[in-house]
Amino acid sequence: KIQHCAFGAGVGLLLVLYFFLYDMTKTERGSFGTKIGVILATAGSAVGLGNIWRFPYLTGKDGGAAFILIYALFVFALGIPGMICEFVVGRHGGSNAARAYFKLSGGKAWWIVGAMGMLTSTIILGFYAVVAGWCLQYLYASIAGQLMGDEQYVMTYFQEFSTNPVKPVLCTLAFLLLTHSVVVHGVRNGIEKVSNLLMPTLFLLLIVIAVASCLLPGADAGIKFLFHPDFSKINKDTLLDALGQAFFSLSLGTSCLCTYASYFSRQTNLAKSAVQIAVIDTCIAILAGLMIFPAAFSVGVSPDSGPSLVFITLPNVFNQAFASMPAVGYVMSLLFYALLALAALTSTISMHEIGTSLLYEELHITRKSGAWIQTGVCAVIGVLCTLSCGAVNWLSFAGKSFLDWCDYVTGQMLMPVGAMLACLFIGWFAPRKVVHDEFTNHGTLRSTFYGIFLFCVRFICPVCIVIIFLHQFGII
């Protein structure tokens, strides 16, 4: 009966979302309607599963508040200037990423940067949807009470599910269709409206779970682990961790920010928006730490990072931490996986939009057709990634699954190269007047920080990205 209720709740949620979007006007190219819509939608593109399963772990491992300080410095030196680069290209072009680079470069081959971003985001969406589908399954399992058990049970549950040839595929396709249902309805009536709903909900869930976690006996050890400034832990690896997190957390190198900026109004302050988005992204990551570590330390569990943290470690933590209050543990587990699904959805929407906008504008087809093509391509990648996790052996080679190879190619090659080319283009090749006009909104804003921005883009950002690239390959 519980499973039937959970299934009905899931179907009901999809129907609510459908009718929420059904009467919206279908527009080929629109724009964000409000300032808060700009910030929430673009911040949603940056906020994702990495904020929850990587940043808190790095913070605790690398010196707590000391790591956060170093991370903030890299965000301002690399992340924010990199974001502004894509904002400048996107808003000036007012079109998909490839065409935006084409326009700003005067018809030169820089359009390849935008096309590369579309390729990168499509591959990422393919394998990201797999993990997002796992979030859906675990949300269902939480509702149905299927995650109650000891550590071995939780581990076995994940292994059996992730290697199943059918269930993960269905979950992946379901999440892609959920993403599709938002993107197909356009910018203002789809992406913006849903982001305005999802992001506040995400914040609320984070706060509720974090407060409950911090109130557990022994939670102070987790808070200390996360925030105590331990400068003795600062070393080369700490700096590289902070630099890499600042780069990957803000979706640089995927043309996502460029695509969203094409929907910005001419009155949007690009620099201010970049700072606000970076602050929101960091705050969510810190709240995620407050949600995870106090609960983990309260039961003596050493938290790790990545999928194993959220799909194996945390179910066990919830079961132990709230053993005397099983109803509370049930609710916390349910809220946590709802939060994960929402965080994943805000990211998949933006990745889907990159390819959708390029397809319907360049092929001169409707947004609906472009969205279906993008969904279909990502579905093929997603199914292959899902099956490579254990169901089909030939999809793994050289010690890596197809999913791992997709992650490797995008994270270690395409994203750093794309971000580097974007910075080089804005810093050295784009018309100076256009860049200055976009930064200052054609002189209506003060250009106090323009010189600092240009210096970072020309020198600091390329050096940082080269360091990230070399570190990814184990050279440094």
Regions from the PLM with identified roles:
Residues L17-W53, G82-F87, R91-L104, K108-A115, ...:
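Membrane-interface "cap" regions at the ends of multi-pass membrane proteins
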Residues G106, V113-M116, T120, E362-T375, ...:
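C-terminal membrane-solvent junction of multi-pass transporters and transport-like membrane proteins
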Residues T25, A132-T163, Y263-Q267, K272, ...:
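Helix-loop-helix connectors at the membrane interface of multi-pass transporters/channels
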